[in-house]
């Protein structure tokens, strides 16, 4: 009551809403002039509007008789814009800048909160505004002057060239046919600035008649600002409760609603989370946390949430691993996504991450190199998989992030059994894709009914010592066999040693040893000393059956060898020079893009890959690396395509012979050697092509591809 007495009602005013000009009333603002300097008394020559864009242009006269007007400058501007000859299209017909154009710009797109008010005879009449425009002077005449200047220069140049040339040269015209436009391309085109400008230009101008403030037509139109209805029945918009009237008078601004503090992408607002459906809450939580026990999930969702509904929802977005829930791979890697590290598609990433999750269902520990060797993915992708659900331990590997949740396993045996069936299906798929041998795979625990036993570091060391002692005799025999091979290979280079044919059992055993000797791996090979110049085993090189350019025996009848040879030939036709390390990397990328169950997944050893390279018409280049080089053995094996069938074969062969004696060479030496061998001086383009095919430049020197050490 005290507040009401201090703030008494002075007067009550009736408010009316006028609608006659609701869709036609604009507010013009002139921000470059103070309010005291209006344009009311200045003659308005023309006016036009684009209603859809709410764009207005006004032409106002300039007082050329004013003592402040610079007549010489006005004549110069008119001359620059229209030129010396005046016609109907001239901007300034009087050859003097006697008018000025004003262009509008929108101050706000939301004018629903603004109205024009007229107070008369104790009544307040409101008319909603259709637009609020700010008009500023336009300097488009300067653009016209620049265009005229360019036209005059072009005409002068054309006149000079026409005197020099008797007839115009024939010009080549390129004809292009547009392909069908995709939906994404159409959306990008529609949202482009060029398209919007073209669309705005297509709307025609509507020419208007301007009437001054004191004109009788203006007085007549001003009457429409008053509400025409005499009774209050027609103004039902204002017959509202106080709260509804206040909401109509001051509606919440959309800009204010959107202007909320935005948290970082890795921070989840629990207040916003509560507004989502339960299934979306579970999905958002698992996508952010990656790994979570069921008890923690229930505590985040709140005490009022039904655990049965949560169990039903969690199984749609996560898998059970050691009693804990791990988000599914397809949630993290949607269908159209790819790896930021290697560019691998989402399907390959999901398959690799499922393999990591499956490995953790078998053991608490996972070794990253083993995962990379099976999945053929780069180290960064595998590290991302492991960081989602594990923590690294020095000299041990990656350990699962959370302890085994035995309580959940005992409390929900039906869920555990269902998850066990799902993992069985995933295991079968992984066996088929990665060609895993079932006999060597660890047996899955029945329903994950008990925690996986932990093995201490001392036990692991003791187990390794025991296995080493058991294999000691086998290793001794293997060492003796290799010594004999080396001794036989170095007896006499010209002596051919006769080899007795093996029985079928011995041949199978030898072939198995050869495949186990050099598995396809990203680690550097330690058996370089057992290879000859071209990367072949000592026993086979002595026989001379697989030297440079000769086919691999059995390639025609071996589909794996044929597929491998096709890959090698296609790769060297593009690259010309490759190290063994780079070739293995490209082969792993090729495997990752093949469909599941492809024949190349059966296993390709380093020896088989090198034999195929030599059989495809390539040769090994014995690059003399410096003694202090940090290159691995695989990086020191350099192979090059000897003959590709084009005109540059001879040039490339000369270049490769140069690098068989030099680790790095200057360009002038290469060019002089090419000129000497070919009998004629090669053009710069021909030398550049040969260098681009086989070499890279670093510090003013040229190296074979893959041999530059950072």
From Swiss-Prot:
Keywords, A to Z, come to: Antiviral defense, DNA-directed RNA polymerase, Immunity, Innate immunity, Isopeptide bond, Nucleus, Phosphoprotein, Transcription, Ubl conjugation
User: How is the quaternary structure described?
Assistant: Component of the RNA polymerase III complex consisting of at least 17 subunits: a ten-subunit horseshoe-shaped catalytic core composed of POLR3A/RPC1, POLR3B/RPC2, POLR1C/RPAC1, POLR1D/RPAC2, POLR3K/RPC10, POLR2E/RPABC1, POLR2F/RPABC2, POLR2H/RPABC3, POLR2K/RPABC4 and POLR2L/RPABC5; the stalk composed of two subunits POLR3H/RPC8 and CRCP/RPC9, forming a structural mobile part that protrudes out of the core and functions primarily in transcription initiation; and additional subunits homologous to general transcription factors of the RNA polymerase II machinery, POLR3D/RPC4-POLR3E/RPC5 heterodimer and POLR3/CRPC3-POLR3F/RPC6-POLR3G/RPC7 heterotrimer.
Q: Which residues carry this modification: Phosphotyrosine?
A: 224
Q: Which GO terms describe its cellular component?
A: nucleoplasm; RNA polymerase III complex
User: Which InterPro entries does its entry note?
Assistant: RNA_pol_III_Rpc5, RPC5_C
Q: Which domain of life is it from?
A: Eukaryota
This protein's name: DNA-directed RNA polymerase III subunit RPC5
Q: Where in the cell is it found?
A: Nucleus
Residue spans with biased composition (Basic and acidic residues)?
Answer: 146-155
Residues involved in crosslink (Glycyl lysine isopeptide (Lys-Gly) (interchain with G-Cter in SUMO1))? 498
Where is the cross-link described as Glycyl lysine isopeptide (Lys-Gly) (interchain with G-Cter in SUMO2)?
171, 432, 498, 661
- Quick check: keyword Transcription in the entry? yes
- List all Acidic residues biased stretches: 502-520
Q: Kindly list the biological process annotations in GO that this record carries.
A: defense response to virus; DNA-templated transcription; innate immune response
Native source species:
Mus musculus (Mouse)
Region annotation (Disordered) maps to 146-169, 498-526
Per the entry, what this protein does is: DNA-dependent RNA polymerase catalyzes the transcription of DNA into RNA using the four ribonucleoside triphosphates as substrates. Specific peripheric component of RNA polymerase III (Pol III) which synthesizes small non-coding RNAs including 5S rRNA, snRNAs, tRNAs and miRNAs from at least 500 distinct genomic loci. Assembles with POLR3D/RPC4 forming a subcomplex that binds the Pol III core. Enables recruitment of Pol III at transcription initiation site and drives transcription initiation from both type 2 and type 3 DNA promoters.
UniProt entry tagged with the keyword ATP-binding:
no
Q: Which residues carry this modification: Phosphoserine?
A: 161-162, 192, 503
Q: Where is this region: Required for Pol III complex stability?
A: 558-710
């Amino acid at each position: 009551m005290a507040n009401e007495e201090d703030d008494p009602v002075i007067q009550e005013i009736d408010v009316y809403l006028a609608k006659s000009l609701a869709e036609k009333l604009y507010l013009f603002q002139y921000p470059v002039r103070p309010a005291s300097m209006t344009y009311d008394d200045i003659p308005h020559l023309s006016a036009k509007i684009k209603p859809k864009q709410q764009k207005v242009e006004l032409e106002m006269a300039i007082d050329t008789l004013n003592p402040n007007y610079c007549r010489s400058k006005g004549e110069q501007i008119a001359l620059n814009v229209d030129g010396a000859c005046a016609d109907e299209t001239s901007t300034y017909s009087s050859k003097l800048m006697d008018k000025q154009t004003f262009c509008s710009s929108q101050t706000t797109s939301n004018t629903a909160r603004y109205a024009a008010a007229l107070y008369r005879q104790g009544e307040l009449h409101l008319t909603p505004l259709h637009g609020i425009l700010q008009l500023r002077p336009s300097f488009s005449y300067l653009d016209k002057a620049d265009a005229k200047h360019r036209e005059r220069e072009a005409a002068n140049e054309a006149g000079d060239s026409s005197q020099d040339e008797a007839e115009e040269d024939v010009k080549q015209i390129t004809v292009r046919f547009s392909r069908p436009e995709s939906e994404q391309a159409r959306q990008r085109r529609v949202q482009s600035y060029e398209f919007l400008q073209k669309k705005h230009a297509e709307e025609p101008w509507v020419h208007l008649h301007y009437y001054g403030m004191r004109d009788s037509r203006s007085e007549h139109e001003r009457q429409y600002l008053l509400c025409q209805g005499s009774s209050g029945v027609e103004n039902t918009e204002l017959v509202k409760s106080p709260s509804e009237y206040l909401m109509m008078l001051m509606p919440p601004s959309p800009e204010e609603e959107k202007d909320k503090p935005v948290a970082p992408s890795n921070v989840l607002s629990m207040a916003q989370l509560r507004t989502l459906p339960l299934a979306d809450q579970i999905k958002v939580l698992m996508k952010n946390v990656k790994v979570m026990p069921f008890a923690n999930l229930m505590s985040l969702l709140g005490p009022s949430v039904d655990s049965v509904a949560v169990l039903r929802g969690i199984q749609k977005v996560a898998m059970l691993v050691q009693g804990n829930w791990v988000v599914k791979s397809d949630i993290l890697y949607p269908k159209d996504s790819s790896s930021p590290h290697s560019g691998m598609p989402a399907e390959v990433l999901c398959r690799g991450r499922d393999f990591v999750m499956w490995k953790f269902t078998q053991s608490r520990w996972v070794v990253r190199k083993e995962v990379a060797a099976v999945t053929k993915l780069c180290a960064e992708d595998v590290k991302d998989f492991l960081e989602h659900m594990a923590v690294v331990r020095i000299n041990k590997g990656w350990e699962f992030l959370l302890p085994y949740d035995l309580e959940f396993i005992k409390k929900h045996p039906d869920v555990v059994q269902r998850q066990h069936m799902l993992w069985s299906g995933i295991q079968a798929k992984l066996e088929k894709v990665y060609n895993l041998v079932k006999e060597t795979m660890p047996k899955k625990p029945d329903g994950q009914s008990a925690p996986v036993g932990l093995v201490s570091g001392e036990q692991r060391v003791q187990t390794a010592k025991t296995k080493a002692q058991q294999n000691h005799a086998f290793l001794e025999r293997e060492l003796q066999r290799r010594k004999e091979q080396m001794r036989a290979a170095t007896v006499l280079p010209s002596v051919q040693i006769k080899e007795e044919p093996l029985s079928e059992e011995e041949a199978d055993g030898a072939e198995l040893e050869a495949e186990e000797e050099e598995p396809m791996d990203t680690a550097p090979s330690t058996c370089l000393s057992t290879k000859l110049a071209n990367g072949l085993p000592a026993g086979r090189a002595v026989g001379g059956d697989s030297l440079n350019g000769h086919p691999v025996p059995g390639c025609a009848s071996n589909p794996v060898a044929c597929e491998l040879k096709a890959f090698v030939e296609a790769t060297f036709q593009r690259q010309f020079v490759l190290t063994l390390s780079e070739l293995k990397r490209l082969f792993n990328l090729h495997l990752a893009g093949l469909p599941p169950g492809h024949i190349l997944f059966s296993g390709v050893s380093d020896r088989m890959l090198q034999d195929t390279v030599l059989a495809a018409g390539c040769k090994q280049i014995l690059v003399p690396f410096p003694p202090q080089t940090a290159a691995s053995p695989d990086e020191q094996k350099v192979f090059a395509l000897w003959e590709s069938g084009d005109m540059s074969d001879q040039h490339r062969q000369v270049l490769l012979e140069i690098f068989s004696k030099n680790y790095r060479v200057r360009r002038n030496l290469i060019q002089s050697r090419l000129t000497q061998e070919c009998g004629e001086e090669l053009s710069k383009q021909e030398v550049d092509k040969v260098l681009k095919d086989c070499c890279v430049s670093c510090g003013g020197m040229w190296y074979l591809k893959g041999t530059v050490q950072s």
